Amino acid sequence: VTLGSLRVRQDYMIAEGLLSPYTEGDEETPEIAEWALARIRQLSAHEVGHTIGLGHNYYNSTAGRISVMDYPHPLVTLNGDGSLDHSQVYDAGIGDWDKAAVTFGYQDFIGGGDDEAALIKVLEDAWDNDVRYMSNQDVQTTPQADQWANGTDMADELDRMMDVRSVAMSRFGEAAIKNGMPMATIEEVLVPLYLHHRYQVESTASVMGGVGYIYAARGDGLRPVWHIASEYQNRALDALMRTLSPSELALPTSVLEAIPPRPPGYGRTRELFPRYTGSAFDALTPAFVAASHTVNNILTADRAARLVEQKMLDPSMPGLNDVLQRLFQAAFEGEANNSYETAIRNTVAGVVIERVKSLAETAPMMQVRAQSTLALRTLAGRLAEMEPSGTSVLLQLD
């Protein structure tokens, strides 16, 4: 693994988007350099961990950031005065899980005692402090494990990150780049800011139809499986619906008027938003990208199947149809304050319809296909009564 400039560059762009630090245009930014170096130091420890046999640990512990083997998201919070606090952006040092894992794997217990008992105590002490292990295979099914996420309540964390994003977006502009840089390069910094919440969307979606579990063994007396509380799932859905709000997805006019076509030598790359408008910046595709990310994460085929089954086992739980109706509500009844936001709402509607159509046609579970098909037919009847406002979406339903 090479810890090169590309990794530093990514953290720089995240920080520049959030902080817009170049008010005068030529400021030095040692705080951003330290931000990026803190990530490199942590990543160095992460790779050493792999070298000595440690796997990724994505467990969301009440004890906080317990492992350098996690994929951490930079922690940026709001102060009371509206400023952003990045003093704890990345953790320093080795985590409690890392210490427990190395002790378990490498410690010599001197004194002729019972090594097995000593090893069990290492694990029990870790367990008692909520220092546990979940890895790559766990992140889609349970909100107990997530990549690039902070906190233990995914709904609250998504709302918090949307608040941070909103404040940073309200201040975003030419102060995100240095003097002499083409104004078009604001887009490079805009992308990670606009999508600041993207990984937390994945984490929050894992609450929906989520399953709590541990890798229990016979005789350990531990509860192996439980469903995520309906109240938590409903809060998660509320937070996810916020990410589809036209007012959250609309770019400020000041930003739209600041990004010209790219000059010679500054070609388009995959780090920029797609566009349908030729060389001109596209005001709608950022909303399309963000909305697609939310909707596609909520309506994965396996999550839809779990929603069907959890409603079957416990009618108080949100089911697939409940989630579909919330998405339709956001797509067709969400508040739009102007023609731009109306166009964004229509974009969200198109994203929702396309994803539900995909479930209706290709989901492996028969019940998912049936419920998705019925929901679309019911929606088509409602939209037919909304003519002409429902025309464009009715065409998608055909």
Locate the predicted segments by residue:
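Metzincin-family zinc-dependent endopeptidase catalytic domain
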Residues: V1-T51, V76-L78
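Generic beta-strand/beta-sheet core signal
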Residues: T2-G4, G55, Y59, D70-P72
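Conserved catalytic/binding loops enriched for acidic/polar residues
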Residues: A63-D398
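Soluble non-cytosolic domains of exported or imported proteins
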Residues: E34-L43, Y59, A184, E188-V191
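Catalytic Zn2+-binding segment of zinc metalloproteases
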Residues: V48-T62
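Sparse, context-dependent recognition of short Cys/His-centered cofactor- or disulfide-binding micro-motifs
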Residues: E28, R39, L54, S87, ...
